[in-house]
């Protein structure tokens, strides 16, 4: 059975509590979308999909854990909105399969409260927005789709006050992943014309060009067998721009119109980054490790090494600003821990480039407003850095409307490690047959 718990601030003549979260959303709706509202109230929603949990258990848990008795009230039915004045309801929750950290924390709390839960019990979190103002359904859909919910990871439902008074409700449908498919390996015939190969790349969203598709075709022709769908996907992923950095590795024909000269650059990365660093490394013995590990390592005194890693998370942050930036910063935290024989993260850094957060123009389809990206990215790096115990010691933010299509989200982590560990150079590591592997995270 699914139980619903809704939590909101106390309302009524005896309460002068301000909904700071609601006021923040009201301001963002005005700033980002140009839509004025009289008020916004935000309720927390929890759906408990638990087998052996009773209504009494849920009431006790909500009383003791979910709601603050001084400032909040809760209901275990979908009636809490009756406490507030509103014209529209928008309820937002995660799509099936999307990580719901608040829901996981609520389940952990329930397990602690009750002593145990079933292995397949789940809790799903969401938010119910109560909007008051002169809005039509088109306005509400715009607010929901462009600001309150991110369609990549979230779902939303809309009710008018009229529908609410008539008894219509959102309901307790939980976003469990339901799959009844059997694993199947598909054979792919690559004996195709060049145009058919490109059609295959487009239809399977491989994002590979003609030369790459022909190389795959020729490879399996030499093997004298068909490729499987899994093999094709693995090759496409490995050859993606994200993994392979094909632009950095490509031959670039460069024309200098000032000096009237032309040259072919064989890999921007190898010519201007790796080669330059290698030349410095040959002259500077304090450069201990570059291009060989999860991070670069230098020696800063007789006893200490400093490791540094930075990377971009641009496209993920454009799709899901908070999640994209969060995984960017914790990813480089991980790389520092994993470089050499382990380094301790001591600092984070970042550089952000966005379009103006006050952008008023028409956005292309599927693009988030730059103000929304700005706020989400900032929160993601903050949560993954400062709030995990690693201080963000410096950074910069640059605004230019040419970043409207894709922001630059540059995240970095620095760490310290001793020069030697048990008599061995800490920046060197090797894996041998029979070694144990530890996975963490």
Briefly describe each language-model feature range.
Residues 1-441:
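Core nucleic-acid recognition elements
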């Amino acid at each position: 059975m699914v139980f619903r718990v809704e939590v909101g601030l106390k309302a009524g003549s005896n309460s002068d509590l301000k909904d700071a979260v609601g006021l923040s959303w009201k301001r963002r709706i005005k700033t980002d979308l140009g839509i004025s509202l009289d008020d916004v109230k935000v309720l927390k929603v929890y759906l408990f999909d638990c087998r052996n949990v009773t209504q009494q258990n849920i009431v006790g848990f909500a009383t003791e854990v979910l709601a603050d008795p001084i400032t909040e009230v809760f209901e275990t039915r979908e009636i809490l909105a009756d406490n507030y004045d509103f014209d529209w309801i928008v309820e937002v929750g995660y799509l099936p399969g999307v990580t719901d950290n608040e829901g996981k924390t609520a389940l952990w709390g329930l397990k602690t409260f009750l002593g145990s839960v079933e292995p397949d019990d789940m809790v799903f979190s969401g938010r119910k927005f109560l909007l008051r103002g002169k809005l039509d359904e088109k306005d509400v859909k715009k607010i929901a789709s462009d600001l309150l919910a991110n369609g990549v990871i979230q779902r939303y439902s809309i009710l008018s006050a009229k529908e609410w008074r008539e008894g219509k409700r959102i309901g307790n449908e939980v976003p469990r992943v339901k799959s009844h498919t059997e694993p199947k390996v598909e054979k792919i015939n690559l004996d195709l014309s060049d145009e058919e190969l490109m059609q295959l790349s487009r239809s399977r969203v491989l994002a590979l060009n003609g030369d790459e598709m022909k190389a795959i075709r020729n490879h399996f022709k030499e093997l004298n067998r068909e490729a499987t769908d899994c093999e094709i996907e693995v090759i496409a992923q490995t050859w993606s721009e994200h993994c392979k950095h094909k632009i950095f590795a490509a031959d670039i024909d460069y024309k200098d119109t000032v000096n009237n000269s032309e040259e072919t650059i064989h890999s921007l990365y190898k010519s201007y980054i790796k080669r330059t660093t290698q030349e410095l490394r040959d002259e500077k013995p304090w450069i201990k490790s570059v291009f060989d590990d999860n991070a670069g390592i230098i020696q800063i005194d007789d006893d200490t090494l400093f490791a540094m890693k930075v990377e971009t998370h641009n496209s993920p942050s454009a799709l899901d600003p908070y999640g994209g930036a969060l995984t960017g910063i914790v990813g480089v935290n991980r790389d520092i821990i994993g470089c050499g024989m382990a380094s301790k993260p001591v600092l984070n850094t970042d550089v952000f480039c966005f379009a103006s957060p006050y952008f008023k123009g028409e956005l292309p389809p599927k693009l988030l407003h730059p103000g929304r990206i700005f706020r989400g990215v900032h929160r993601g790096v903050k949560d993954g850095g400062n709030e995990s115990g690693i201080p963000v010691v410096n950074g910069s933010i640059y605004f230019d409307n040419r970043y409207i299509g894709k922001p630059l989200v540059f995240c970095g982590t620095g760490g310290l490690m001793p020069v030697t560990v048990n008599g061995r150079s800490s920046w060197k590591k090797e894996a041998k047959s029979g070694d144990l592997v530890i996975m963490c995270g």
